[in-house]
Amino acid sequence: MLPEAVALAHLNGDLHYHDLDYHPYQPMTNCCLIDFKTMFKLGFKIGNAEVDSPKSIQTATAQMAQIIANVASSQYGGCSADRIDEVLAPYAQLNYEKHLKLAEDWIPDTTQHHDFATARTKKDIYDAMQSLEYEINTLYTSQGQTPFTTLGFGLGTSWIEREIQRAILKVRLGGIGKEQRTAIFPKLVFSLKRGVNLAPKDPNYDIKELAVRCATKRMYPDVLMYDKLVELTGSFKAPMGCRSFLQGWWDEHGQEINAGRMNLGVVTLNLPRIALESQTLNEFWQQLEGKLEIARQALCYRIERVKEAKPFNAPILYQHGAFGRKLSRDGKVDDLFRDKRATISLGYIGLYEVATRFFGPDWETNQEAKAFTVDIVKKLYQHTQDWGNQYGYHFSVYATPSESLTDRFCRLDLERFGSVPDITDKGYYMNSFHYDVRKKPTPFEKIDFEAAYPPYSSGGFIHYCEYPNMVQNPKALEAVWDFAYDRVGYLGTNTPIDKCFECGYEGDFNPTERGFECPYCKNRNPETCDVVKRTCGYLGNPQARPMVAGRHKEIVARQKHLTIRIKSSDKDQNPAADKED
């Protein structure tokens, strides 16, 4: 079904046409920001059921779970709920009003009415958010997997919005089940904003402190830097899925629209392949132009195929409000895509390997090499801008997560070029613009290094820093968040949170050829341990769902970017804590 040049390039490993198990066989979209606000306000339909506006926060979160399940079954990428604290607050307000009326009817002392209603509402909020977390982790889509879900929150300042934020974090801190395992979904994305929660004087600073504590224990939430994200993408919004960002967009009435928009798919270039085929920088640039032309064909084909969908193919998306507008049964789905309302993504992988080919493996401090890699992303950006103006869709540059592609591209190039030091011999390619995981820059050095790329890769990006166990030192993590605020738009925390339920060890499990094992008792049974690693933008359980060999090698190679000496008082909590992380 693919154009011949595109199919050949995919098979050869020059590029990767993502999600071939769904597209182009079906005209499906990738990821989206679901328009929960409008669906809740106006009501919606799922199957044969007409669903009215919720009358409580418990009903709202139950409806949210059903919408997520239906949306995830109608597309192949992640689905996100943006500003969930603000979206759910009106329905928690209904809880408060109900409890206040109950207090007025039954409690003679009027001074107790507000306190009674507030306490009951807080309990309702916690229960609702806990139910949502359990619902998402026990749902299965028609594809047979848990929906890849992201919740964005953190900007609301009313007492109800603050309580929703607090409940989301407390539920995550509490864990799942009797063993209190770390929940993989939903991905939590906490918004930092100057004047709201960034500094101790800000009204929501206490929520930020709770978010930091949650990240030290559960890795999530990742954090969005409000001002920087607006600078990079043109407006503020949560990512679709793990890292795909919509660009600022205003409708014909001048209204900014984020919820209800979507991405139409990804095609990723194998940049190390181009470098390995080139003897000089000039040859690299010439080869890149040829590969970009094939990528353009692939992306245009994705668009044309998705446009063939009919609204009745995915009613929840096109007819019942998830995509922000309600089309007729036979309407044109392109009305929701064109005029740059939707994005289509040109991905890339392996800037580290490209520069290594021409400047050696330690090029990160070489300004000429760094400028060369930035120029590559600029070149991709220039082409996507030209394509967007030509075709009327928002072509964006996307720092591909490469959960399995890191293995596939490297494996194909190893077969073609042999073992090339620091390129194919590693068994994996570095994600997008990321610093070599084998090196040990400080978090501040890594953030400063990577900050140059997202201005040209704003269609999708994330930065990570690797830490030792930070539970006893949350202020160190907060210092990194604060440093990053004016430098990058989106930051994740990677810290050891593995648990062994046989011996009680908590920390970093040792990697082996058969997965990960407890360093103290050698346990590797997924039933009696909880191993959580950052596989790409999402967390993963590699014991329960093993990753590809290349990603496993990349995770094993990761070095900590911060060193903290464990105090003797902490060693008693951990039988294996007699070392420096």
Explain the meaning of each model-derived region.
Residues 123-133, 357, 548-556:
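Metallocofactor- and cofactor-centric catalytic cores in central/energy metabolism, strongly enriched
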Residues 522-572:
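Long insertion/accessory domains within large nucleic-acid-processing enzymes
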Residues 1-340, 361-362, 366-527, 531:
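Conserved catalytic cores of very large enzyme subunits
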Residues 86, 344-357, 378, 534:
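Contiguous, well-ordered alpha-helical segments that form the cores/surfaces of helical PPI scaffolds
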Residues 271, 341-345, 533-536, 544:
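Generic secondary-structure boundary/loop-capping signal
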Residues 577-581:
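Short, low-complexity, charge-dense intrinsically disordered segments
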